[in-house]
């Protein structure tokens, strides 16, 4: 997937699953949209579905400090590169 395709998919997940419409790419999701740890776990599951893989524990731990859409997209780009 290209970065643009991943970005669109992540934004669609936020709209469909979390009812966060048009999030700013650099918004602090925790502060601006009250995105919490339960949401983060759900997002990781959606990323697994998107990529068609089960994430390793290390990959999940690496996601815990992510706070913005841009950071999520960077994370998924790295994961997508690992699965190819």
Q: How would you name each of these model-derived features?
A:
Residues 2-45, 49-84:
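Phosphopantetheine-dependent thiolation modules in NRPS/PKS and related acyl-activating systems
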């Amino acid at each position: 997937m290209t970065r643009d395709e991943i970005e669109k998919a992540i934004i669609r997940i936020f709209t469909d699953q979390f009812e966060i419409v048009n999030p700013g790419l650099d918004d602090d999701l925790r502060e601006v949209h009250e995105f919490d740890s339960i949401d983060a776990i759900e997002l990781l599951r959606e990323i697994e579905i998107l990529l068609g893989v089960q994430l390793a524990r290390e990959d999940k731990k690496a996601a815990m400090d992510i706070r913005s859409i841009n950071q999520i997209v960077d994370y998924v780009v790295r994961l997508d590169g690992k699965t190819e």
